[in-house]
């Protein structure tokens, strides 16, 4: 069937038409009816071909929805059953509680008869009456303090409250400002005090550094003096040995020479002691910066020690005795004692010179003790004082020159004494 052909129409035949129409007309009507039926069948086929897939999908969706709805229905039924069961349990519990709470006549009678319960109820009644009285009093006070915005008393009270609040704020500001000023003043004082403490601490540190430098210089000078003293002692011991050997080799020939021997021995001893005292005074005045009175006192004390040494060991007056070797040994011993005492006076003079150092911290005794202790352990201080000697090069040079001169004077005196003893 094409689009140009008209659409067939439904053929309708009544009973009268079936009787009146001829066979040919009936055939034509039948053919029209067949075309109409074919057209309907074609339309139905077209509709079936287009909508079968959609109908299947919709059918599957409907089946899934039906299954979900059935599952939900089952879940809801189960929940409903559980809720009904819980409701039944709650109703049973409520009934049980009602039965329990409804006391029987015997329970009521026993509770009324019990004196403890009666006392408890009486106390509860008294407390209830007290609370009611307090509540009424509080309500009366509240109603008395209530006022409307238009009332004059309320306005006055509000103005008074505002004024009091302002005064309180002003007083708080004044107090805070006064406290802040006081704290600022205290802070300034503390800062000033801390600055003063810092300055004093710096001064003390400088003073301590200066004292350390002075002590190091003194230690270096003490070390140098100890070395010089050791060298002089070695020289004296060597000279004494040479003198002893020379005195033993040359015997006395004439008595006048032996008679003049004590005077010649005493004079060089006195001269050597005086020279040593002068040199020691010069050395002690070098590092200790002593005055002239200290120098005189040190020289006189050293001279006294030398003279006392001469008096302790006087020479024998016998000139031509056969024990001339013993006399010469005794004179040598006296010279050794004089030299030893001169060395001791030298050490005491050095300690006295170091005691005259001005130290405000009261460390004079420690310095002298250190100078006395360093005589025994000079070897241990040599390695420590050698790098520090560069700080006191001038002082060391001056003291070394003085000690060199003193050592030369002692050597000349001892050589003169040995020559006199030989003569």
Curated annotation (Swiss-Prot):
Residues 239-276, 285-301, 358-377, 392-404 have a biased composition (Polar residues). Its main location: nucleus. Keywords: Cell cycle, Developmental protein, mRNA processing, mRNA splicing, Nucleus. GO terms for biological process: mRNA modification; mRNA processing; regulation of alternative mRNA splicing, via spliceosome; regulation of apoptotic process; RNA splicing. Residues 405-423 have a biased composition (Low complexity). InterPro entries: WTAP. Residues 234-423 are annotated as: Disordered. The keyword Cell cycle applies. It is found in: Nucleus speckle; Nucleus, Nucleoplasm. One of its GO terms (cellular component) is RNA N6-methyladenosine methyltransferase complex. Disruption phenotype: Multiple developmental defects at 24 hpf (hours post fertilization) including smaller head and eyes, smaller brain ventricle, and curved notochord. Belongs to the fl(2)d family. Associated component of the WMM complex, a complex that mediates N6-methyladenosine (m6A) methylation of RNAs, a modification that plays a role in the efficiency of mRNA splicing and RNA processing. Component of the WMM complex, a N6-methyltransferase complex composed of a catalytic subcomplex, named MAC, and of an associated subcomplex, named MACOM. Component of the MACOM subcomplex. This is Pre-mRNA-splicing regulator WTAP. It comes from Danio rerio. The lineage of its organism: Eukaryota, Metazoa, Chordata, Craniata, Vertebrata.
């Amino acid at each position: 069937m094409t689009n140009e052909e008209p659409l067939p129409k439904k053929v309708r035949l009544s009973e009268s038409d079936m009787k009146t129409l001829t066979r040919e007309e009936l055939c034509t009507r039948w053919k029209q009816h067949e075309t109409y039926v074919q057209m309907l069948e074609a339309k139905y086929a077209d509709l079936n071909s287009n909508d079968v897939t959609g109908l299947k999908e919709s059918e599957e969706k409907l089946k899934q929805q039906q299954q979900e709805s059935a599952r939900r229905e089952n879940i809801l039924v189960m929940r409903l059953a559980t809720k009904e069961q819980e409701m039944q349990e709650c109703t049973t519990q409520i009934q049980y509680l009602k039965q329990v709470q409804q006391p029987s006549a015997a329970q009521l009678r026993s509770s009324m008869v019990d004196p403890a319960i009666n006392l408890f109820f009486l106390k509860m009644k008294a407390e209830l009456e007290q609370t009611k009285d307090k509540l009424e009093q509080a309500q009366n006070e509240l109603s008395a303090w209530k006022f409307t915005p238009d009332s004059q008393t309320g306005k006055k009270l509000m103005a008074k409250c505002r004024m009091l609040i302002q005064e309180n704020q002003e007083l708080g500001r004044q107090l805070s400002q006064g406290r802040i000023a006081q704290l600022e003043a205290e802070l300034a004082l503390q800062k000033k005090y801390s600055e003063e403490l810092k300055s004093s601490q710096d001064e003390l540190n400088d003073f301590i550094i200066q004292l350390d430098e002075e002590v190091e210089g003194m230690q270096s000078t003490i070390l140098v003096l100890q070395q010089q003293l050791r060298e002089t002692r070695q020289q004296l011991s060597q000279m004494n040995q040479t003198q002893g050997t020379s005195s033993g080799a040359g015997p006395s020939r004439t008595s006048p020479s032996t008679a003049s021997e004590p005077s010649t021995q005493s004079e060089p001893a006195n001269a050597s002691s005086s020279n040593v005292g002068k040199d020691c005074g010069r050395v002690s005045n070098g590092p200790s910066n002593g005055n002239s009175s200290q120098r005189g006192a040190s020289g006189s004390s050293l001279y006294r020690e030398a003279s006392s040494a001469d008096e302790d060991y006087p020479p024998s007056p016998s000139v031509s005795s056969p024990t001339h070797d013993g006399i010469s040994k005794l004179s040598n011993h006296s010279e050794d004692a004089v030299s030893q005492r001169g060395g001791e006076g030298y050490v005491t003079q050095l300690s006295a010179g170091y005691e005259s150092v001005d130290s405000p911290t009261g460390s004079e005794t420690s310095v002298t003790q250190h100078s006395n202790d360093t005589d025994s352990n000079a070897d241990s201080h040599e390695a420590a004082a050698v790098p520090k000697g560069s700080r006191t090069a001038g002082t060391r040079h001056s003291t070394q020159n003085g000690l060199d001169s003193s050592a030369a004077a002692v050597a000349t005196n001892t050589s003169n004494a040995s020559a006199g003893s030989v003569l």
